[in-house]
A protein has these predicted regions:
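Short intrinsically disordered, low-complexity coil segments enriched in acidic
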Residues: 1-9, 217-219
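Low-complexity acidic/polar repeat-biased segments
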Residues: 1-5, 123-169
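Disulfide-bonded cysteine-rich modules in secreted/extracellular proteins
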Residues: 6-15, 160-181
């Protein structure tokens, strides 16, 4: 069976792929796209869309609007560009050999992105905008669970791996930060602002520095 291309109407559509390499495009409206098996390209286009990659090496492109992207099994790529809103990724894949990635569009470098940890979620915010990506449960089990993403890629060739991301989200800003440790001996420094530091497991050193800070040692 050959690869299929399906395009939606201007309304709220539900499109389903087959066990081949499908291309599904949502067009206007708040659409639901399900690639099923195969190496699929899912494009939400405009609207608040829901994209399910299914099994296979899928590319999920939310487009404009606040979209939900579910990659599932396979080496999946989530693409994001300026002005595309606030997307949420749930990347549940138990394959230990997978390489799942976020790819930012032209003109976006690593210096344009602010990385934060919100509980177990990874939040990537495009500076000077309201655009952001939330990767649900990324830090579950210290970023070793099924929900992790292996790479964050930029068009200039720079790639952030898991270890780099784990380090970056522990760096304080001049504002009010929430910093989290891992199940190792962490050193967290709040810097300026009214900060909250969470050591979690391990023999940690928590330094509030300036501001009215709250420090939680953990186990």
């Amino acid at each position: 069976m050959k690869a299929l291309v399906q395009k939606a109407t201007d309304g709220n559509d539900r499109l389903y792929g087959y066990a081949v390499a499908d291309t599904l495009s949502g067009g206007l409206g708040n659409d639901s796209l399900d690639g099923y098996a195969g190496n699929d390209l899912l494009q939400g286009d405009e609207g608040h869309d829901i994209l399910y990659g299914g099994a296979g090496d899928d590319t999920l492109v939310g487009g404009l609007g606040n979209d939900y992207l579910y990659g599932e099994a396979g080496n999946d790529v989530y693409r994001f560009d300026r002005g595309w809103g606030q997307d949420t990724i749930q990347n549940n894949d138990s394959n230990t050999n997978k390489v799942d990635a976020i790819e930012f569009g032209s003109g976006i470098s690593a210096n344009d992105i602010l990385l934060n940890r919100d509980s177990d979620n990874l939040v990537l915010t495009l500076k000077n905008s309201t655009d952001r990506i939330t990767v649900s449960s990324y830090f579950s089990q210290d970023a070793t669970s099924n929900y992790r993403l292996e790479e964050i890629r930029f068009v200039d060739g720079q790639v952030l791996n898991i270890d780099t991301v784990k380090s970056l989200v522990q760096q304080a800003t001049d504002g009010n930060d929430r910093l989290f440790g891992y199940a190792v001996a962490d050193t967290l420094s709040g810097g300026l602002g009214n900060d909250s530091l969470y050591g979690y497991a391990g023999n940690d050193l928590l330094q509030g520095d300036e501001g009215n800070d709250t420090l939680y040692g953990g186990a």
